[in-house]
Amino acid sequence: MPLTMSQAFIGNFLGNSPKWYKIAILSFLIINPILFFYVSPFVAGWVLVLEFIFTLAMALKCYPLQPGGLLAIEAVAIGMTSANQVLHEIEANLEVLLLLVFMVAGIYFMKQLLLFAFTKIITKVRSKILVSLMFCLTSAFLSAFLDALTVIAVIIAVAVGFYAIYHKVASGKDFSAVHDHTSESNTQLNNSELESFRGFLRNLLMHAGVGTALGGVCTMVGEPQNLIIAAQANWQFGEFVVRMSPVTVPVLIAGILTCLLVEKFRIFGYGAKLPDAVHKILCDYAAHEDAHRTNKDKMKLVIQVLVGVWLIAGLALHLASVGLVGLSVIILTTAFNGITDEHALGKAFEEALPFTALLAVFFAVVAVIIDQHLFAPVIQWALSYEGNTQLVIFYIANGLLSMVSDNVFVGTVYINEVKAALIDGQITRDQFDLLAVAINTGTNLPSVATPNGQAAFLFLLTSALAPLIRLSYGRMVWMALPYTIVLSVVGVLAIETGFLEQATQYFYDSHMIIHHSAKDVIAPLTSH
C-alpha cells in the first residue's frame, strides 16, 4: 500500500530518526511561538535553550544541525532575535569558524605523521597503563597547540585505522585487500577478542578525549571558547598560558594521576587489555608499512614534521590568526607533498564543515540569550558576591551549564555578560581578568562530564567509529565520571583557597604579566 502524503512527510522529516523524536521536534516548533507571544519571551527563550540542549543530548538519534537549525530559524522568524544579531555573533567569532574550517583540514594532511607516531606508541609499548598515559599526555600536548577537535579527529582516524586492519586480517584477508570493516556479519571473527579490542580502543579514546581537555584549557588555541575569551580580554598566547596556570597545572597533575588510578584498579570501564593476537596483527602491519615505505613516503613525513614545527611556532609567537596558520598548514603540506587534486583537497574539509555549520547555529542561540537577557539574573546574582566566592560561583555556574550544554556558547555568553559588567563599571579590570580565568576553566574542565559540553566529545560520539567500538552516550558519561569529579574539584580548590589570586599577584609583581585597563576591552567593542 502506497504511503499517504502525511506519512511521506513524517518519513522524510529528519530521515531515520525515531518517530517519537520527530514528533518532539515538531512539538517544539509549535510550542515556541505560543510561549513567545502569549506567555513570556523570557520563558520562551529558556525553553528554546533547553530544547537546543535536548537536541545535543540526542546527537546519536539525529545530528543536531537539522533539529537545532530549525529551532534557530524559527527563533529568528518569530523575533526572539534578529538575523543581524546572529550575523554579529558569527562575525565576532569568525576566528573560531576559521579555526574549525582550516585547522582541522590542515591536520588532515598531517595524519600520516600522527598515525605513524600513535602506531609506534601502541606497537612498541606493551604496558596498558603506560600506553594510556602516553595517549593522554600526547593529546594534552597536541591540544595545547591544535584545537581539541582536530586532535580527536586524528585519534579517531588512528583508531579506525587499527580497527579496519584487525577486522580485515581477522576476516582472512591481507593488508592490501579491499574490505568493509563496518560489516557485522563475518563469522570468522573471534567475538571475545573483538570485544576486548573494542574495550581497549574505548579506553584510549576516552583518555585521549580527557587529555584534549587537560591540554586544551591551557592555551588560547586549545578550545574555541578560549580564543573568544582571549580576544575579549585582549590577551596574547603567552599571557593566556601564564594567567591560566594556577588552575591548569594542578588540574593537569590530578588528571594524570586519575588516568593511572582508573587503569591500575580497572574501574569505570577502564583496564581493558589489548589481546595478544590483535597486537601481533598491528605489529605485522607496522612492519609491513615500514618495509614498504619509499623515500618519497619518508620525505612526506619529514615535510609534515617541519610543518608541525611551523604550526607550533606560528601559534606560540602569534605570527598570524589561528585560522590563517591553519590555512598555511594546508598550503605547505599539500604543495610540498604533491596533493594538488581538487577532490583530494575536498576530503579534508568533510570532517569539520558539518560541525562548523552547527557552531553557526550555536551562535544563533547565543543571539537569543543575549537579546532576551536570559542570563542577566544569574550574572547579577553572581556579581553580588565578592572575592574568591564570586570566582567560585562563576566557575561552578559555567561548569554546571557546560556539563549539559556546549561550552563554546556557555563561555561566549558569560564572557559577554562579564564584559558588559566591566563597561558598566560594576567590576574592576583586574577582577574581570580573574573572572575570565574562572569562566575559561569553568567551561573547559567540568564539561568533560557529557558529550554535550565538549565539542571534541560530541564529535567522537557522532563519528563513524562510535558504533564500531560500542561507545554510546551513557557509556561516555560513565567513563568520564572519575575525570569529571577530580578535574572539577581540583579546579574549585585552586580558586577557592585563594591560590589563583595569590599566584596572579605574584605574576604581576614578577612582571610576567601586566595590569590591563578597561579601555583594552572597551576599545575593540567601540571600533567594531
UniProtKB/Swiss-Prot annotation:
Catalysed reactions, semicolon-separated: 2 Na(+)(in) + 3 H(+)(out) = 2 Na(+)(out) + 3 H(+)(in)
Tell me how this protein sits in the membrane.
Answer: Multi-pass membrane protein
Disulfide bridge positions per record: none
Query: Transmembrane residues, as ranges?
Result: 10-30, 63-83, 96-116, 131-165, 204-224, 240-260, 305-325, 359-379, 391-411, 449-469, 476-496
PANTHER family, A to Z? NA(+)_H(+) ANTIPORTER NHAB (PTHR43302:SF1), TRANSPORTER ARSB-RELATED (PTHR43302)
One family name in Pfam for this protein: NhaB
- GO cellular-component terms in the record? plasma membrane
InterPro entries the record matches:
Na+/H+_antiporter_NhaB (IPR004671)
Protein family according to the UniProt entry: Belongs to the NhaB Na(+)/H(+) (TC 2.A.34) antiporter family.
Q: Name one GO molecular function term.
A: sodium:proton antiporter activity
From which source organism is this entry? Shewanella sp. (strain W3-18-1)
Q: What is this protein called?
A: Na(+)/H(+) antiporter NhaB
Primary role? Na(+)/H(+) antiporter that extrudes sodium in exchange for external protons.
Q: Which UniProt keyword terms apply here?
A: Antiport, Cell inner membrane, Cell membrane, Ion transport, Membrane, Sodium, Sodium transport, Transmembrane, Transmembrane helix, Transport
Its organism's taxonomic lineage begins at: Bacteria, Pseudomonadati, Pseudomonadota, Gammaproteobacteria, Alteromonadales
Q: Where in the cell is it found?
A: Cell inner membrane
